[in-house]
């Protein structure tokens, strides 16, 4: 018999390498939440290996925080987690406390990723951006536009985007597609601006 998931049932994500290798963190099961699988995460961080150390990262549409926690474990300088759902954002904060992360290393902002990115910036902030939005809402393209329009990206920033498989993605002309793979129902790509 299949177990019925309640909204506050807990799953977990595993950190696969770095300072907290093998550590498992609780994740609330929430509608639309799809933590990035270990194989995809391992491939992504193999791509990012030369760049992640001391980088400033944005985990947009953070959800489980799987990508941001992995970046912190691999010694990113700072990760900003954006999460709209207050309960999920609170779980991210608890996990950061469990890992003993300071506010200089990580912050959780309980706000829509798109609303956050609408704020124009005087100076760019991020070396690496993770975008893994809920599927079927075209949120990735909206977030990409806002990242560029509002000066969030440092020169040569790396932008990781997860979308539904076979969904064409419109990106700025000056972005270079560095890597692309598909698995199951997911396409994932790494760009550089």
Swiss-Prot record:
It comes from Haemophilus influenzae (strain ATCC 51907 / DSM 11121 / KW20 / Rd). This is Ribosomal RNA small subunit methyltransferase D. The lineage of its organism: Bacteria, Pseudomonadati, Pseudomonadota, Gammaproteobacteria, Pasteurellales. CDD domains: AdoMet_MTases. SUPFAM superfamilies: S-adenosyl-L-methionine-dependent methyltransferases. It catalyses: guanosine(966) in 16S rRNA + S-adenosyl-L-methionine = N(2)-methylguanosine(966) in 16S rRNA + S-adenosyl-L-homocysteine + H(+). It holds the Pfam family Cons_hypoth95. The keyword Transferase applies. Specifically methylates the guanine in position 966 of 16S rRNA in the assembled 30S particle. It is an enzyme of class 2 (transferase). Its EC number is 2.1.1.171. PROSITE patterns: N6_MTASE. Belongs to the methyltransferase superfamily. RsmD family. Keywords: Methyltransferase, rRNA processing, S-adenosyl-L-methionine, Transferase. One of its GO terms (molecular function) is 16S rRNA (guanine(966)-N(2))-methyltransferase activity. It comes from the Bacteria.
């Amino acid at each position: 018999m299949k177990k019925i998931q309640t909204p506050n049932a807990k799953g977990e994500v595993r950190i696969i390498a770095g300072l907290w290798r093998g550590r498992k963190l609780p994740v609330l099961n929430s509608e639309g939440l799809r933590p990035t699988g270990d194989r995809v995460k391992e491939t992504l961080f193999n791509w990012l290996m030369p760049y992640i150390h001391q980088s400033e990262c944005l985990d947009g549409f953070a959800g489980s925080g799987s990508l941001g926690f992995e970046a912190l474990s691999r010694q990113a300088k700072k990760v900003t987690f954006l999460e709209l759902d207050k309960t999920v954002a609170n779980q991210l904060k608890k996990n950061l406390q469990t890992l003993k992360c300071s506010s200089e290393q990580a912050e959780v902002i309980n706000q829509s990723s798109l609303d956050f990115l609408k704020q124009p910036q005087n100076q760019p902030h991020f070396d690496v951006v993770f975008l893994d939005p809920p599927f079927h809402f075209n949120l990735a393209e909206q977030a990409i536009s806002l990242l560029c329009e509002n000066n969030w990206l440092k020169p040569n920033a790396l932008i990781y985007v997860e979308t539904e498989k076979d969904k064409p993605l419109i990106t700025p002309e000056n972005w270079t597609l560095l890597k692309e793979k598909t698995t199951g129902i997911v396409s994932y790509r790494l760009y550089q601006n």
